[in-house]
Amino acid sequence: MSLEIQSKAVVVDDDLVYLQTVGLMLKKLGFQDIKLFSNPIDALSYIETIQIDLIVSDWDMPLMTGCEFLEKIRKNPKTNSVPFILNTGNRSEAYWRQAITAGVTEFLFKPFSYSVFKDSVFIAIDLARYDRRHHNSISKLAC
């Protein structure tokens, strides 16, 4: 199964091997426009200029953690509903609890397989679509 729409994704990781690997996996899934960033500061600047369909980010990065990046994404009305997959090699329960509190859509532990990544991408996109439909339904009821 692959995406059949012009899907845009942003990938952020200071580990260039993971950055390239995740980019290739997204391409295989059908994403048409994939932008790779080695730090979240540059990614935030880019995200301000375009509508995107998915963000995949590492947690442990210099300048700003992936969770801090997620918090900034969720605070921005333009990006607060974008599916966000956060990944880390740290298996601390505190990490995933903090990510859930910040509004993560999916959480992956490194290393992960293509199959696990693929499932996470489709789950994240489906959850975001459901949330948007649910929000729109509630908005219509309120009118």
Model-derived features with residue positions:
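C-terminal output helix
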Residues: 94, 112-121
